[in-house]
Amino acid sequence: MTEPVQLWQRRIESVASNLREAGLSAEVLCVLGSGLGGFADRLEDRVECSYADVEGLPRSSVPGHAGRFVAGTLDGVRILCAQGRVHLYEGLSPFELTLGVRAVARLGVRAALFTNAAGGLRSEWEPGTLMRITDHVNRQGGSPLLPGEGGAGNPWATEAGLGEAIDSVAEERGIAIQRGVYVAVPGPSYETPAEVRFLREFGGDAVGMSTVLEGVAAQAEGMAVAGLSCITNHAAGITAAALSHAEVLEVGRQAAARFGDLLEAVLPRFAQA
């Protein structure tokens, strides 16, 4: 953190002001990971805004991340979907990466669901498995917290109502869902088989390159947070299959209907949780 806190706060407020001018408002935020962005099409009365049209907001450059906000309603609840996210490996600092999340919080959003496509560290979890994040391991080498901010340590365990809402809806809809620890790594390369063995022994169940810093920053801004991973591939060395981003996107698309059914019922409940 090389810039004064006051300057960062002004940057947050500037982006928040630009979001308001774009007509974006919501009660609940949902960040959609690789191959999962199609869920936003389920919203009614949609208002769309490209990240590129919001001055001061970092832009996503990764395939499978459309790079736009879509605001709309589900069951009368105003939802803001972020179709795609930015990552550390795109040359951003932890604070720059979470600037959008903090700005959205200034719009009055009080609950957030962060989703991602992740590599599975368990051989028994086939691609397409959904996992609710119950804890995380941050191996990204930094924190998004500003000087003077404190974190609760595990943002995914502090709001039991959100986790219970996900579990309840999954049971009602007959959607199988696992629970586990998400390990965040810097990327952009996939892990080696040796690293995968280490992460599994470390207590991880899924590995990816996002989500953790966003969740920490969202909690610092006063939002209740929850996380969902779509296991899109076995991590390196668990099977003989080669890893590719194309596979990640394809499995995400295949799981989209089941994933979308879960989100469609869960997100309105977040407004009351």
PLM feature spans:
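Metabolite-binding pocket within alpha/beta catalytic cores that recognizes anionic/polar moieties
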Residues: T2-N154
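Non-catalytic positions within long, well-ordered alpha-helices that form the structural scaffold/packing
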Residues: V104-G108, R200, Q219
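Short acidic/polar active-site loop segments enriched in Thr and Asp
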Residues: R110-A111, D205, A224
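Active-site/ligand-binding-proximal alpha/beta "capping" segment
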Residues: G163, S168-D205, L263, F270-A271
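Zn-dependent metallopeptidase/amidohydrolase metal-coordination segment
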Residues: M209-E247
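His/Asp/Glu-rich mid-to-C-terminal helical/loop segments that flank catalytic regions of hydrolases
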Residues: A236-A273
